[in-house]
């Protein structure tokens, strides 16, 4: 698997199920195909957790299985493998969802004026909420001041533009170079 695809697969695994999911994916990459018990043994992760991770990967379209019945016991064994053919579509879909969420956050940040007491961990309040509390923090009682969210807005805009370029929805801006004046001018 190409390094970039592998990196993106591991990032998605991390989002889905944390470090344990990353370990399961790495083990499955090495083994190509394995049962949940084999993966549990290879990773040291409990079988129930491995199964949960495999089902989550399957729900995302990143893992698939084949079911084989043991003729002697009648039990079914599930052999799991990674399914990366749809990885580019999955990545694009996740990025589109992130883009939508960022645009909603930007809309929220630009459509409201927020107030805050300045204490880390205390809530930002909208104008209406600040009015309800008579411009005093509901936690510490300090006076609420208008919150400068320009850094948040700029970061959201930057990330939105970055995603739009990655997704091919927007062209990368060209760097403008300053023209040197000729001596004849």
Curated annotation (Swiss-Prot):
GO biological process, one term: regulation of DNA-templated transcription
SUPFAM superfamilies according to UniProt: Winged helix' DNA-binding domain
Keyword Transcription regulation part of the UniProt annotation: yes
Gene3D superfamilies to which the protein is assigned, alphabetical: Winged helix-like DNA-binding domain superfamily/Winged helix DNA-binding domain (1.10.10.10)
Keywords: DNA-binding, Transcription, Transcription regulation
Keyword Transcription regulation: yes
Domain named HTH TFE/IIEalpha-type: residues: 5-88
Disulfide bond annotation, renumbered to this chain: none
Family, as annotated: Belongs to the TFE family.
Function: Transcription factor that plays a role in the activation of archaeal genes transcribed by RNA polymerase. Facilitates transcription initiation by enhancing TATA-box recognition by TATA-box-binding protein (Tbp), and transcription factor B (Tfb) and RNA polymerase recruitment. Not absolutely required for transcription in vitro, but particularly important in cases where Tbp or Tfb function is not optimal. It dynamically alters the nucleic acid-binding properties of RNA polymerases by stabilizing the initiation complex and destabilizing elongation complexes.
Entry text on domains: The winged helix domain is involved in binding to DNA in the preinitiation complex.
Oligomeric form and interacting partners: Monomer. Interaction with RNA polymerase subunits RpoF and RpoE is necessary for Tfe stimulatory transcription activity. Able to interact with Tbp and RNA polymerase in the absence of DNA promoter. Interacts both with the preinitiation and elongation complexes.
Protein name in UniProt: Transcription factor E
Organism listed in the record: Thermococcus kodakarensis (strain ATCC BAA-918 / JCM 12380 / KOD1) (Pyrococcus kodakaraensis (strain KOD1))
């Amino acid at each position: 698997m190409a390094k970039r695809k592998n990196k993106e697969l591991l990032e998605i695994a991390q989002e889905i199920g944390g470090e344990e999911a990353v370990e399961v994916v790495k083990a499955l990459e090495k083994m190509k195909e394995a049962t949940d018990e084999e993966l549990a043994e290879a990773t040291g992760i409990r079988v129930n957790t491995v199964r949960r991770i495999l089902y989550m990967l399957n729900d995302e379209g990143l893992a698939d299985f084949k079911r084989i019945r043991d003729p002697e016991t009648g039990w079914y064994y599930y052999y799991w493998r990674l399914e990366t053919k749809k990885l580019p579509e999955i990545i694009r879909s996740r990025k589109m969802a992130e883009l939508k969420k960022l645009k909603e956050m930007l809309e929220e940040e630009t459509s409201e004026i927020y107030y805050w007491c300045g204490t880390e961990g205390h809530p930002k309040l909208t104008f209406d909420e600040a009015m309800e509390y008579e411009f005093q923090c509901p936690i510490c009682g300090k006076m609420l001041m208008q919150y400068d969210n320009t850094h948040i807005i700029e970061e959201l805009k930057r990330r939105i533009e970055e995603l739009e370029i990655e997704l091919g929805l927007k062209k990368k801006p060209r760097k403008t170079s300053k023209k040197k004046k000729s001596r004849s001018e």
